């Protein structure tokens, strides 16, 4: 049977049963019919779903179609979802962006890639977001160019792609964003992406980020310094133990333990008495990582901490130190 209103046709009885409601004058009826159509999980139903996404007069129906197409990666579906990123209704654009972010195949990514240079910033950012999850090497040049985009969301998604793909050639550009970008989230994302470095070339940028005016960036810098694994980061992390935000101090504690920075001993012992239990717990674990049995008296003094998670961490640290001492 051919639908008189479009060029789609089918002999599938389940789809045929739904056609009258798919063409109903009531948008609510059409939306429910679309849901039932998607439940069939039939590739043959895709033309009706994509038509609803691109042509239905109701934003509710278009948004529903965008959500229902999430699991499909046929080129025509992906292209329709990309086109829906330009829809006049924000709900439709958001649903299309979410469905695109669930794509898994490189073939789908190649359909998305041209949309990453669209004139509209939301389209560019959404396309880059979808490409990030796909780890499509073809997207690297586009992502590098997007690091200089005027829109912060686009820059942040570009950083994500380069980080996921571990593009070490982009490290100088990422370091500059980590230090100089005007947007907090871009600086934070770029700081995290510097963790892919295998040498100390990014340490100046990370140390600068550890003094950023926004604590979220400082927190990311403290974490990333531990991942880079350079002992020369120790003094900067030690200084971060006095940061005004406990979240930054906590990440600095973890990184100091990870680096086994011996000079952190006194600072970590002091934090065993901090009012925030998470800091006490992480400090105990870090002291265990340092491997200095001179921390045993301080750990034994807090083995009956009021917080069970702290007590557990203290026991782990004491066990580590005693094992090394034996």
Where are these regions (language model features)?
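Terminal, low-structured helical/coil segments at or just beyond the last alpha-helical repeat
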Residues: 303-326
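A generic tandem-repeat structural signature
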Residues: 58-157, 161-164
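Core register positions within helices of long alpha-helical scaffolds
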Residues: 36, 68, 99-102, 130-133, ...
């Amino acid at each position: 049977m051919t639908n008189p209103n479009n060029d789609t046709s089918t002999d599938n009885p389940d789809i045929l049963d739904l056609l009258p409601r798919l063409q109903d004058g009531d948008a609510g009826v059409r939306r429910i019919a679309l849901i039932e159509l998607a439940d069939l999980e039939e590739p043959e139903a895709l033309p009706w779903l994509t038509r609803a996404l691109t042509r239905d007069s109701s934003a509710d129906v278009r948004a529903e179609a965008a959500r229902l197409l999430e699991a499909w990666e046929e080129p025509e579906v992906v292209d329709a979802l990309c086109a829906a990123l330009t829809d006049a209704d924000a709900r439709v654009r958001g649903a299309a962006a979410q469905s695109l972010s669930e794509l898994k195949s490189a073939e789908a990514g190649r359909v998305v890639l041209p949309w990453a240079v669209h004139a509209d910033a939301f389209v560019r950012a959404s396309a880059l977001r979808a490409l990030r999850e796909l780890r499509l090497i073809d997207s690297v040049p586009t992502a590098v160019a997007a690091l200089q985009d005027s829109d912060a969301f686009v820059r942040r998604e570009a950083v994500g792609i380069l980080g996921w793909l571990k593009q070490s050639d982009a490290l100088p550009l990422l370091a500059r964003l980590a230090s100089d970008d005007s947007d907090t989230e871009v600086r934070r994302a770029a700081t995290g992406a510097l963790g892919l470095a295998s040498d100390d070339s990014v340490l100046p940028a990370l140390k600068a980020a550890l003094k950023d005016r926004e604590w979220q960036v400082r927190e990311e810098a403290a974490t990333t310094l531990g991942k880079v694994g350079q002992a020369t980061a120790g003094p900067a992390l030690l200084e971060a133990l006095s940061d005004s935000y406990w979240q930054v101090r906590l990440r600095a504690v973890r990184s100091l333990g990870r680096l086994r920075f011996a000079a952190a001993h006194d600072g970590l012992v002091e934090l065993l008495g901090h009012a925030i239990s998470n800091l006490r717990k992480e400090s105990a674990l870090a002291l265990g990582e340092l491997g200095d049995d001179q921390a045993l008296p301080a750990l034994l003094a807090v083995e009956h901490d009021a917080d069970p998670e702290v007590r557990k961490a203290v026991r782990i640290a004491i066990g580590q130190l005693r094992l090394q001492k034996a």
